[in-house]
Amino acid sequence: MKKRDKILQEAKARLVAAFGDKIKDVILFGSRAWGKPHRWSDWDFLVVVRGAYDWQTVRTIRFIMADIDLDFDVFTQTLVVSEMELTNSLRGRQPVFTDAIQNGVYA
């Protein structure tokens, strides 16, 4: 298994272990997903959640991803968005989200 796929699957497994079916998708996007990273490229993740979320949810997700950083010796950047935001808000239409949804690698 590629390192990319291993990290992606592990991230999803840890998030689902913490949040259950509240986690809809974990998507890798950016240079790591599209095969054009350089040595110091970060790992960009979009976590799509079902239902509402708050700052505590975002903090816990980022703590889980920080453990991924340490365990795999990588640097992750993680964005969190809800299904509702993606379909019903201006925030959900931002190019960073639409690009990740359309072109990212799903766990």
Q: Which functions belong to the PLM regions below?
A:
Residues 42-48:
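Short, aliphatic-rich beta-strand segments
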